[in-house]
Amino acid sequence: MAEELVLETCDLQCERNGREHRTEEMGSQQLVVRRGQPFTITLNFAGRGYEEGVDKLAFDVETGPCPVETSGTRSHFTLTDCPEEGTWSAVLQQQDGATLCVSLCSPSIARVGRYRLTLEASTGYQGSSFHLGDFVLLFNAWHPEDAVYLKEEDERREYVLSQQGLIYMGSRDYITSTPWNFGQFEDEILAICLEMLDINPKFLRDQNLDCSRRNDPVYIGRVVSAMVNCNDEDHGVLLGRWDNHYEDGMSPMAWIGSVDILKRWRRLGCQPVKYGQCWVFAAVACTVMRCLGVPSRVVTNYNSAHDTNGNLVIDRYLSETGMEERRSTDMIWNFHCWVECWMTRPDLAPGYDGWQALDPTPQEKSEGVYCCGPAPVKAIKEGDLQVQYDIPFVFAEVNADVVYWIVQSDGEKKKSTHSSVVGKNISTKSVGRDSREDITHTYKYPEGSEKEREVFSKAEHEKSSLGEQEEGLHMRIKLSEGANNGSDFDVFAFISNDTDKERECRLRLCARTASYNGEVGPQCGFKDLLNLSLQPHMEQSVPLRILYEQYGPNLTQDNMIKVVALLTEYETGDSVVAIRDVYIQNPEIKIRILGEPMQERKLVAEIRLVNPLAEPLNNCIFVVEGAGLTEGQRIEELEDPVEPQAEAKFRMEFVPRQAGLHKLMVDFESDKLTGVKGYRNVIIAPLPK
């Protein structure tokens, strides 16, 4: 009888498999593979080699704390000559004496997560078991049978493999972009993402059920949406805060990447990191989903409605002086960010595959938990409010009507309705380019089109009862060129009288500093014209000067000023409202790269910023990071104040680890100028072979 097989070594071929599965940037010390795609391991036996017909080889793969075959968290399969579809398989590739090359493959519906791999070798009645090591299995956007399959290679590179991106902010009238280091392949990030799954409340409640559902990106997306915020006291990653008091943490505007946030969360023992706002929640969720293999992108909706009572109407109240009053919990955010993830929806009727909206910012509860989605973007566009998950809330974010109630001194209220204010310029980064792609058409039909009215009717929203008021007077607010931080600037109310007679009116213009979520601060400009005569079929403009000395001390991290114009006609008592959010532009950070950009070769970055204010900047800090370029974050604190019109500057050495296109990202903070962002694309040449 042949002596039993004894395994001497096993090579999981981490480097080779990583290249073939596009996971090599996660490191060569662990095996990370994508489901449905074969990976190769090498077995070296001591003494004699494997003999077909004499020896039997089988493999066990297990994931989770209580693996069970019926739950899909354990599989036992034997070595064969050809792979089997739809199940785990092991195929003999090559034998050289005592060395065996075996190709293993998971089904395209396998559970994602960390697996234990075991070899069972038997000869006759003798048998031994050998632990071969652990590996991590991810979703596979390259496999046609995977639920996250994405057809175009350039889209897979952008939405799964790209570690850097741009997030759109500012206002509808002045869209800005901020760089973000997603860093899903950076050290520790994969382990942190898996840990997030293993401490989520659904796992703690029923470990077997939770692990059995990890083959479904819909389920994973819902878990991640809940775990990125901490509002359910579930060991979530980020604590949200919107009141401009961030002294005991980080201002949301100061972050430039997810890596620092996720590492802090782990270092804190899975306690919330302070603080996040919508783009931070969305960016961290995007990192986690890309890390797990799900195509994901951050999306920005301008003039985003927060409809708390579900009636698809946002009620806002203004005093006679144009000051906003808080009588409703409904809000309009200058912008709001969420994540889109690409996946099929076999849990729904046909037609809802593709991009799904996931919103980890804690706003409203869904099934008792602060999470939102996945909501099929197609269902949002069609007004299919009964489709899972959370369609009514997202539908309102992009479609709600806005009603301004002007509260008069005697308590009487006048109504001014605006039905095409919400859901503008829905934006995401273009594939392969640093430019903005407008995806509004994927969420809604053109404003005022017959199809749009049809969708509203389906959403059981009687839009006709709120028809846009056709006043004979019309008003809009325009901005003079360049509202630069540190400078004075003008805004103009343009008023047109489209009637045949002269109108006597009162105009009030009010400017206040504001946060991006619609909250307003102190007044920084006001004008009250008691007797404004408007000639028939004429337009005239009224300027309002806004001074830095008035807005500067109260400007929030969002660099926003909200201008409200209220025009009241004396004869009828009717009012017209116009509102504009003005974005105050920060100075540019200039970045120069010195040296030949090559892998493993030292480079120098020269970083400069001019102080545009008429007063010194104190406590100046530069924070620099870039996936594949820097080892974590670099922080440079300047010793001296930066005088008016002087430069804040420093030089930094770094050694790029990875070839290809990368972004070097910079954040600047000081006592009077905060959240200033800049980036430079750097193409790193590979090492000569």
Curated annotation (Swiss-Prot):
Residues 431-441 have a biased composition (Basic and acidic residues). One of its GO terms (biological process) is protein homooligomerization. It catalyses: L-glutaminyl-[protein] + L-lysyl-[protein] = [protein]-L-lysyl-N(6)-5-L-glutamyl-[protein] + NH4(+); L-glutaminyl-[protein] + serotonin = 5-serotonyl-L-glutamyl-[protein] + NH4(+); L-glutaminyl-[protein] + dopamine = 5-dopaminyl-L-glutamyl-[protein] + NH4(+); L-glutaminyl-[protein] + histamine = 5-histaminyl-L-glutamyl-[protein] + NH4(+). SUPFAM superfamilies: Cysteine proteinases, E set domains, Transglutaminase, two C-terminal domains. Predominates in mature erythrocytes. Also found in kidney and cardiac muscle. GO terms for cellular component: chromatin; cytosol; extracellular region; mitochondrion; nucleus; plasma membrane. It is found in: Cytoplasm, Cytosol; Nucleus; Chromosome; Secreted, Extracellular space, Extracellular matrix. Its main location: cytoplasm. GTP binds at R476, I477, K478, L479, S480, E481, G482, A483, R580, D581, V582, Y583. The keyword Mitochondrion applies. The keyword Protease applies. The record marks Y516 as: Important for catalytic activity. It holds the Pfam family Transglut_N. The active site is at C278, H336, D359. InterPro entries: Ig-like_fold, Ig_E-set, Papain-like_cys_pep_sf, Transglutaminase, Transglutaminase-like, Transglutaminase-like_sf, Transglutaminase_animal, Transglutaminase_AS. SMART domains: TGc. It comes from the Eukaryota. Residues 427-453 are annotated as: Disordered. Calcium-dependent acyltransferase that catalyzes the formation of covalent bonds between peptide-bound glutamine and various primary amines, such as gamma-amino group of peptide-bound lysine, or mono- and polyamines, thereby producing cross-linked or aminated proteins, respectively. Involved in many biological processes, such as bone development, angiogenesis, wound healing, cellular differentiation, chromatin modification and apoptosis. Monomer. This is Protein-glutamine gamma-glutamyltransferase 2. It comes from Gallus gallus.
